[in-house]
UniProtKB/Swiss-Prot annotation:
Notes concerning its domains: Has 3 domains, the large (RuvB-L) and small ATPase (RuvB-S) domains and the C-terminal head (RuvB-H) domain. The head domain binds DNA, while the ATPase domains jointly bind ATP, ADP or are empty depending on the state of the subunit in the translocation cycle. During a single DNA translocation step the structure of each domain remains the same, but their relative positions change.
Binding site for DNA: 292, 311, 316
Region (Head domain (RuvB-H)): 256-345
Protein name: Holliday junction branch migration complex subunit RuvB
Positions bound to Mg(2+): 67
Localisation: Cytoplasm
Superkingdom, taxonomy of origin: Bacteria
One Gene Ontology term, aspect cellular component: cytoplasm
Record keywords: ATP-binding, Cytoplasm, DNA damage, DNA recombination, DNA repair, DNA-binding, Hydrolase, Nucleotide-binding
Enzyme class: hydrolase
């Protein structure tokens, strides 16, 4: 099963791009209370001074609203919004074309900035710091350096892997913001709003059931809501209750805590093949036939956040909660070995 095929994948699909479902202002945006409060201050200050907002870096797992927040920022600043992603900017000319078309105070959003070509990144430094492009025109003896003045713009970038950003690039962002997983209450509010927009009758306990299985991620909550709507429609349900939501999500193999077949396979593999751990990430990747990056970026963050696994110097170890979730009793010797592992950290 590839990552995009999972219904609980936070990777964006075409069906997830529904502009009617997206909040249009910071006041409408649910969750990320600290980030929203700080952004309001920074936006109001920049708007009052008539200046470009400092460059912003959003850090966090996929599906938490980084793109939506960038769009809201541009809307509340009253400026144009341009969007691209790191892998798309293949060469310096691509970046130059983007930057030279920006107007004063415009917002340029670069998703997956950690995947930016290193040669392109070098061009970005003076653009961010001095609002200048420093390009080499021509080759050999005829080559010459050309400086191009740029409009004072705001770069808003997003990354799921802060550690892959170079220090010079990371240090040029004046406003770093880390986004966190959402609470069940926040996701319930998002699901309720989505159902209202879709004209879908949804009981409070039905919204809560969907929210509890959405892995702390609004994008997944929206996807689960659409699939539950399909099941409810075919079943002729007039109102989506907890019972209907539970039946639909169980059919989709999403359990009560939001784990799917791949998550359970991950946990079962560590129990059955390695006695609960510790086991190294490369071994896990080989056993699951999944790329290491996918495991570290997509599967493990939620399992760690839920307290199912721990990363130790000797590898991954299942916590007692994971054993119980699988219907198993954690061995006493494993509990003792976990204590010893954390004493070594």
């Amino acid at each position: 099963m590839s990552e995009p095929d999972r219904i609980v994948s936070a990777v964006q699909r075409g069906e997830d791009i529904d502009t009617t479902m997206r909040p249009q202002s910071l006041d409408e945006f649910v969750g990320q209370k600290t980030a929203r409060a700080n952004l309001k201050v920074f936006i109001e200050a920049a708007r009052s001074r008539g200046e470009a907002l400092d460059h912003v870096l959003f850090v966090g797992p996929p599906g938490l609203g980084k793109t939506t927040l960038a769009q809201i920022m541009a809307r509340e600043l009253g400026v144009n919004f341009r969007s691209t992603s790191g892998p798309v900017i293949a060469k310096a000319g691509d970046l130059a074309a983007l930057l030279t078309n920006l107007e004063e105070r415009d917002v340029l959003f670069i998703d997956e900035i950690h995947r930016l070509n290193p040669a392109v990144e070098e061009i970005l430094y003076p653009a961010m710091e001095d609002y200048q492009l420093d390009l080499i025109i021509g080759e050999g003896p005829a080559a010459r350096s050309v400086k191009i003045d740029l409009a004072k713009f705001t770069l808003v970038a997003a990354t799921t892997r802060l550690g892959l950003l170079t220090t010079p690039l990371r240090d040029r962002f004046g406003i770093p913001i880390r986004l966190e997983f959402y609470t069940v209450d926040e996701l319930q509010a998002i699901v309720t709003r989505g159902a209202r927009i879709m004209g879908m009758p949804l009981a409070e306990d039905g919204a809560e059931e969907i929210a509890r299985r959405a892995r702390g991620t609004p994008r997944i909550a929206g996807r689960l809501l659409r699939r539950v709507r399909d099941f409810a429609y075919v079943a002729g349900a007039e109102n989506v209750t907890r019972q209907i939501a539970d039946a639909a999500l169980s059919r989709l193999e999403v359990d009560a805590l939001g784990l799917d077949q791949l998550d359970r396979r991950y946990l079962h593999m560590i129990v059955e093949n390695f006695g609960g751990g510790p086991v190294g990430i490369e071994t896990i990747a080989a056993a699951l036939s999944e790329p290491r990056d996918a495991i570290e970026d997509i599967i493990e963050p939620y399992l760690i956040q839920q307290g199912f696994i721990q990363r130790t110097p000797r590898g991954r170890v299942l916590a007692a909660k994971a054993w119980r979730h699988l219907g198993l009793n954690p061995p006493k010797e494993l509990a003792q070995s976990q204590i010893n592992l954390f004493e070594e950290e």
